[in-house]
Each structure stands twice: as structure tokens, then as C-alpha cells.
Swiss-Prot record:
<feature type="short sequence motif" description="'KMSKS' region">
    <location>
        <begin position="244"/>
        <end position="248"/>
    </location>
</feature>
<feature type="binding site">
    <location>
        <position position="247"/>
    </location>
    <ligand>
        <name>ATP</name>
    </ligand>
</feature>
<keyword id="KW-0963">Cytoplasm</keyword>
<dbReference type="InterPro" id="IPR049940">
    <property type="entry name" value="GluQ/Sye"/>
</dbReference>
<dbReference type="InterPro" id="IPR001412">
    <property type="entry name" value="aa-tRNA-synth_I_CS"/>
</dbReference>
<dbReference type="Pfam" id="PF19269">
    <property type="entry name" value="Anticodon_2"/>
</dbReference>
<dbReference type="GO" id="GO:0006424">
    <property type="term" value="P:glutamyl-tRNA aminoacylation"/>
</dbReference>
<dbReference type="InterPro" id="IPR020751">
    <property type="entry name" value="aa-tRNA-synth_I_codon-bd_sub2"/>
</dbReference>
<dbReference type="GO" id="GO:0005829">
    <property type="term" value="C:cytosol"/>
</dbReference>
<keyword id="KW-0648">Protein biosynthesis</keyword>
<dbReference type="GO" id="GO:0004818">
    <property type="term" value="F:glutamate-tRNA ligase activity"/>
</dbReference>
<keyword id="KW-0436">Ligase</keyword>
<dbReference type="InterPro" id="IPR000924">
    <property type="entry name" value="Glu/Gln-tRNA-synth"/>
</dbReference>
<dbReference type="InterPro" id="IPR004527">
    <property type="entry name" value="Glu-tRNA-ligase_bac/mito"/>
</dbReference>
<dbReference type="GO" id="GO:0000049">
    <property type="term" value="F:tRNA binding"/>
</dbReference>
<keyword id="KW-0067">ATP-binding</keyword>
<comment type="subunit">
    <text>Monomer.</text>
</comment>
């Protein structure tokens, strides 16, 4: 008998941005489907009408696209499936696996207070649940009932969690939860079940904040005669300080990492190592990750987010990246700043100079901007470095630059000849030259900077300071 094709899903609620925890869930679900030749489904759980927004949906789609987590089916929207949910609820009412409940809020509040006074766990008491020989109250006039699920009253719900191991919950711990509100709208736990059933989901990979939902969802699936998927609940992500990851730990939105100059390849690599490992391997490609990924090596303990490690990874990926790719990314960032990317030398040349000393794309763009815009150094920097002695040396050097062959070796010799003429050491010429050309005292090798900047720009910028 052929194995059931793998079908995983990512099902975010569009009430905000795509955060790091959600991105990791999406990555693991996507990788599992790719590893097993399966299908990855994107589902938007937008039943919280008050908080769901089109902007949040777009932010999720943008984040997925930036990370390169392409879905095979979807996105499916729960609000577009309401008729299907209501159809299944009617089937359950007819089958006796669900029932109408007319208990008012006041009655539920009184029941809760009574149970709490007795130190009992608050739960619905089943007063409207049909049973053989039981006479139900007369439905009150003008009251719209909710629909509750007939949760089993005996036995246990058990599943072998692919991360946490065997989990068993006694059905006596669960009550008859609401699957449709009084206005007829189905609840989250019910919609999820119908979606997973209809979409043939085989593995549900999600955060462990959903563990408590799982026994209820399994019971509904079994009541529907549906196949129960395997579940894998991922541990939470903690911040650098060991507390739950939040805004105070820095960027939490995936697209914020784009804004801050991280490469998607670096973020993917880092997310992959948040709770999963393959021996001591720290750096690997997306393709290698898919080949290696399994659920057996996901740790059940909380993962800790380490910004320094992410920064280290990002710097590594920038060093290894193709110069043309980096130049295109830098050009986009310059354009967003209002800087013409074509106002300076070829960005690929600038990128080649600076990629080994840049931790992110924004640092690369900062450097490139100095080549595109004639930057004026701060007055105190000019006062410190462009002394009369330095200006005299730069005037001699400018004259040499007018005639010299424009290659690194010849430019280096021109600088050395100027040093000899004025009795100066390399820093006494190179630092003022950096300040005059780029407005900063520190750059890569000065002869390389001069070569890339080009004769016309070098002469013009020197003339401005010597005028």
C-alpha cells in the first residue's frame, strides 16, 4: 500500500506581522513537505474579524515571499469557508455529536463562581447535553443558542507528539466546548479541524501554545470519522535574556530584518538552528537544510534567540554572496534613501571593497553612499585631519593623480612619492586623503578606494578641499 502523501500547512492569523516564531513554524512545515516530496499549504485564519486586517495578510505574504517559502496551495481564507463550517455543524447536530446550548452568560458566571468556591476546575456542566432518559429544559423564547461539541466523557485522548513524545489527556479534563457562537459563526478550534480534514493535512507542525487545543481537535476529528494527522509542537523561542521573545529584544517582524539589512539566506539558516540541529553544522544552504531536515532532531526544550549569532551568520553570508546580487540590494537601499545609485562608480566594485567588513546590507549601503555623494566631513574631523601640512601633501598628490596611470599599483606609488616629497608617513597622507574623498578617516586600502572612486571624482573632491 502506497504511503499517504505528506501535506503540511502554515496557518497564521492576520492580526499583525509575520513574527520570528511564526516564520520558524512556516520554515519547518515547508521543509518537511519539501523533504518528503509533499505539498505545503498556506491558510489564513482570519475569523477574528475585529483584529484581522488586509495589511496584516499582506505582511504575512511579503514575509513568506522574502524568506522564499513558496506554498503549493492557497492561500485559503477561513472567512471564505463559512458555509462549509456551518454545513459540518449541521451534520454533527444531526448525528448527535453536537447540540444546542441555551445557557445564558449569567448562568455560566454563576456556575463558574460556584465551582471556584468549591476549588473545582471551571467547566460547563452539560445541562443542555442530550442523554438517554434525560429530559432537557424547554428552550427559552428569543434566545439564540450556541452549539457545543459532545466531548467523550470517558477514556483518554492520546497522541504521539513528534517533538514532545506521548501525551495523554483524560476526557474528564475536557468539557463540551463551543463550536458555533450564538450568531452562528464557528469558533477557531472547530474551523481548524474542518480545514485540516478537508485539506488532507498529514502533519501539523505548530507552536506548543497549541498543545491544549490538540485533544479537543482530535476528539472532533474522530467524531467526524476523519483521519487524525500527526502533531509536532515546537517549543517557544526565548530572547537573549531567557525571557519570552518580544519587541524589547529587538526585531521580531520578519520584514524588519529585511529593513535592517539581513539577507534572507542568513535568516533562514538561523531560524533552522532555533530548536533543530544536524550535528555540529552551523552553516548550510537552504537545499542542504531540506535534505537534512527531520522532526527527530527538534529539541523539546525552549530555543534561545541570540542576536550576536544571527549577526555573525549574516556577515558570513554577505562575505560569500555574489557581488552583483549585493550591488542590486545596495542599489535598492540607496534609491529608498533618495540617493542615485548610478551617481558613483559601479556598485559591484564598491561592494567588493566593503563586503568583508560589513555586517549587513545597510552598512554596505552606508559605504556605497559615500561614493555616490560628495560627503562633507564633520568640521571637527576636517580640523583634526586636514591640517596645512596635510593640504600641502594632498595638493602634490592631486597633481600626480592628474597624470598617473589609473591602476592600484600606480596610485600606490603616487602616494608613496608624495610621502617621500613631504617627509610624511603613510597615515599622515592616507587619513587626510580618506577624509577629503569620503568624509571619514577609516576605509579599506586607500589605493583601492582611489582606484574605484575614479580619476574624475577624486580630482573634483580634492579640488574642493584645496580650494
Amino acid at each position: 500500500m502506497a504511503a499517504t502523501p505528506v501535506r503540511t500547512r502554515f496557518a497564521p492569523s492576520p492580526t499583525g506581522y509575520l513574527h520570528i516564531g511564526g516564520a520558524r513554524t512556516a520554515l519547518f512545515s515547508w521543509a518537511y513537505a519539501r523533504r518528503h516530496g509533499g505539498r505545503f499549504i498556506l491558510r489564513i485564519e482570519d475569523t477574528d474579524v475585529a483584529r484581522s486586517t488586509p495589511e496584516a495578510v499582506q505582511a504575512i505574504l511579503d514575509g513568506m515571499k522574502w524568506l522564499g517559502l513558496e506554498h503549493d496551495e492557497g492561500p485559503f481564507y477561513q472567512m471564505q469557508r463559512m458555509d462549509r463550517y456551518k454545513e459540518v455543524i449541521q451534520q454533527m447536530l444531526a448525528a448527535g455529536t453536537a447540540y444546542y446550548c441555551y445557557t445564558s452568560k449569567e448562568e455560566l458566571d454563576a456556575l463558574r463562581a460556584e465551582q471556584e468556591a468549591k476549588k473545582e476546575k471551571p467547566r460547563y456542566d452539560g445541562r443542555w447535553r442530550p442523554a438517554p432518559g434525560k429530559t432537557l429544559p424547554t428552550p427559552p423564547a428569543g434566545v439564540q443558542p450556541v452549539v457545543r461539541f459532545c466531548n467523550p466523557t470517558t477514556g483518554v485522548v492520546a497522541w504521539d507528539d513528534l517533538v514532545k513524545g506521548r501525551i495523554e489527556i483524560s476526557n474528564t479534563e475536557l468539557d463540551d466546548f463551543i463550536i458555533a457562537r450564538a450568531d452562528g459563526t464557528p469558533t477557531y478550534n472547530f474551523c481548524v479541524v474542518v480545514d485540516d480534514w478537508d485539506m488532507g493535512i498529514t502533519q501539523v507542525i505548530r507552536g506548543d501554545d497549541h498543545v491544549n487545543n490538540t485533544p479537543r481537535q482530535i476528539n472532533v476529528l474522530q467524531a467526524l470519522g476523519a483521519s487524525v494527522p500527526q502533531y509536532a509542537h515546537l517549543s517557544m523561542i526565548l530572547g537573549d535574556d531567557g525571557t519570552k521573545l518580544s519587541k524589547r529584544h529587538g526585531a521580531v517582524s520578519v520584514m524588519q530584518y529585511d529593513d535592517e539589512g539581513y539577507l534572507p539566506e542568513a535568516v533562514i539558516n538561523y531560524l533552522a538552528r532555533l530548536g533543530w540541529s544536524h550535528g555540529d553544522d552551523e552553516i548550510f544552504s537552504r537545499e542542504q537544510f531540506v535534505e537534512w531536515f527531520d522532526l527527530d532532531h527538534i529539541t523539546p526544550s525552549a530555543a534561545q534567540f541570540n542576536t550576536e549569532k544571527l549577526n555573525w551568520l549574516n556577515a558570513h553570508y554577505i562575505k560569500q554572496a555574489d557581488n552583483a546580487y549585493l550591488a542590486a540590494e545596495v542599489a535598492n537601499r540607496l534609491a529608498r534613501r533618495g540617493v542615485d545609485p548610478e551617481a558613483g562608480p559601479a556598485l559591484e566594485q564598491v561592494v567588493a571593497l566593503y563586503k568583508d567588513r560589513s555586517a549587513n546590507l545597510n552598512e554596505l549601503a552606508d559605504a556605497a553612499e559615500l561614493f555616490c555623494v560628495d560627503v562633507h566631513a564633520a568640521p571637527e574631523v576636517i580640523a583634526q585631519h586636514l591640517t596645512d601640512t596635510a593640504r600641502a601633501a594632498l595638493a602634490s598628490l592631486r597633481a600626480r593623480f592628474e597624470a598617473v596611470a589609473w591602476d592600484k599599483a600606480a596610485l600606490n606609488q603616487a602616494i608613496k612619492d608624495t610621502m617621500a616629497e613631504h617627509g610624511l608617513k603613510m597615515p599622515q597622507v592616507a587619513i587626510p586623503l580618506r577624509v577629503a574623498l569620503l568624509g571619514v578617516p577609516q576605509t579599506p586600502s586607500i589605493d583601492a578606494v582611489v582606484e574605484v572612486l575614479g580619476r574624475e571624482r577624486v580630482l573634483a573632491r580634492l579640488a574642493r578641499h584645496l580650494g
